[in-house]
Amino acid sequence: MAEDTETRPASAGAEEREEGEIADDGDGSAAAAAGRVSAHPLENAWTFWFDNPQGKSRAVAWGSTIHPIHTFSTVEDFWSLYNNIHHPSKLNVGADFHCFKDKIEPKWEDPICANGGKWTISCGKGKSDTFWLHTLLALIGEQFDFGDEICGAVVSVRKNQERVAIWTKNAANETAQISIGKQWKEFLDYKDSIGFVVHEDAKRSDKGAKNRYTV
């Protein structure tokens, strides 16, 4: 009841939290309760990851510089995070943002990603912001008919171009992959052809793997 919430004391451990530690919002405070009532839950929880290998030795193993930023599960949490991090056009060359379903790591070695592949869209420098945002909204809003096949999305900033990619689970499921590719182009109003590369093919090829599917 409201009376109980208002009279409940603040968390006893507030003074004991280490610097930088996020307070637990489950303490029953009126503000937290109000936030939970008004929040709009997403069908899946998602985690933002950041990879900035700049300044790292080339000998560092691929994927070792990727680290999670924050996991969100409501519309409000998404916008709070998105509005407080750099957009892709502001990132250093070589950096990547990843947004993957919670518990899935944005790595080929992750068991859920291992048999999958990715659709990729390339664009000019500074042009990826809109594509990235619209891709995120389509993902967290569950706009894809084969949404269960999707692992997450990546935006990559490189010297001469920027790329946005959608990673999927099962490259052999041609029906699902073609549907995802076509719908993604529709959501972004993207007119050029895009290709789907299987992760296993990419790992075996030093010069770039051929597209398994094209839409």
From Swiss-Prot:
EIF4F is a multi-subunit complex, the composition of which varies with external and internal environmental conditions. It is composed of at least EIF4A, EIF4E and EIF4G. EIF4E is also known to interact with other partners. In higher plants two isoforms of EIF4F have been identified, named isoform EIF4F and isoform EIF(iso)4F. Isoform EIF4F has subunits p220 and p26, whereas isoform EIF(iso)4F has subunits p82 and p28. One of its GO terms (molecular function) is RNA binding. Disulfide bonds join 113-151. It is found in: Nucleus; Cytoplasm. Residues 16-27 have a biased composition (Acidic residues). GO terms for biological process: defense response to virus; regulation of translation; translational initiation. Belongs to the eukaryotic initiation factor 4E family. Gene3D superfamilies: RNA Cap, Translation Initiation Factor Eif4e. Component of the protein complex eIF4F, which is involved in the recognition of the mRNA cap, ATP-dependent unwinding of 5'-terminal secondary structure and recruitment of mRNA to the ribosome. Recognizes and binds the 7-methylguanosine-containing mRNA cap during an early step in the initiation of protein synthesis and facilitates ribosome binding by inducing the unwinding of the mRNAs secondary structures. Key component of recessive resistance to potyviruses and bymoviruses, including barley yellow mosaic virus and barley mild mosaic virus. SUPFAM superfamilies: eIF4e-like (SSF55418). Keywords: Cytoplasm, Disulfide bond, Host-virus interaction, Initiation factor, Nucleus, Plant defense, Protein biosynthesis, RNA-binding, Translation regulation. According to the redox status, the Cys-113-Cys-151 disulfide bridge may have a role in regulating protein function by affecting its ability to bind capped mRNA. Residues 40-43, 50-86, 134-143 are annotated as: EIF4G-binding. Changing residue 161 to K: In strain: Sukai Golden and Mikamo Golden. In allele rym5. Residues 1-35 are annotated as: Disordered. It comes from Hordeum vulgare subsp. vulgare. One of its GO terms (cellular component) is nucleus. PROSITE patterns: IF4E. MRNA binds at residues 58-63, 90, 108-109, 158-163, 203-207. This is Eukaryotic translation initiation factor 4E-1. Displayed sequence is cv. Morex.
